[in-house]
Amino acid sequence: VGCLTGQRVSDYKRINSKMIVTLTDGNKYIKLKQEKTGNIVYIPLDYRVAAILDKYNGTLPKVYDQKINDHIKEIGEALGWTEIVELDEQRGAMEYTAKKRFCDLLKTHTCRRSLATNMYKAGASLSSIMAITGHNSEQQLKTSLKLDESEKSMLAAKENYFTKLRIAK
């Protein structure tokens, strides 16, 4: 549900069928008031979220955040996302490089970033993504996007400036 709504765990755990509304475009949305910011967002209702809500009679099962994080890590491991990655960490004044399995770094907030990144890669504008995630500024949102340098360049190549130049193939 987190990867399909782009919400914080505190918000997507509260999603229920009473939040589903149909807007003037005829599509169904989840109308949600975010706990942290108080922002009201309208999230397009993905058929998979609808199926999950149907399965549980309109209310998601109650699960502790840590248990959700454990399941996300297990899924990452089952998918083979076990490569060792290095990250800079700090404890007090001491900085060091830690080595961890990629799957062990996955958590509920990864779901929120994944939706934002996937939407952006698919060509959604920052303002469209912000309307769903509830980020208050583009700068805030940009820190959530996980793109490597080649992905950033390929996205830039789709901008009007470059499409008018006709990039060599």
What are these regions (language model features)?
Residues 70, 81, 159-169:
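C-terminal secondary-structure termini that scaffold catalytic or DNA-interacting sites
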Residues 5, 14-52:
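Conserved tyrosine-mediated DNA breakage-rejoining catalytic core shared by Y-recombinases
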Residues 34-38, 133-158:
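Catalytic-site neighborhood detector that most strongly recognizes the C-terminal catalytic loop/helix
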Residues 1-10, 117-118:
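Short pre-functional
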Residues 19-26, 104, 121-145, 168:
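Short, polar N-cap/turn motifs at the start of nucleic acid-interacting alpha helices
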Residues 10-15, 129:
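Alpha-helix N-cap/helix-start motif at helix boundaries, enriched for small hydrophobics
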Residues 58-62, 73-131:
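Short, basic (Lys/Arg/His-rich) helix/loop patches that form interaction surfaces
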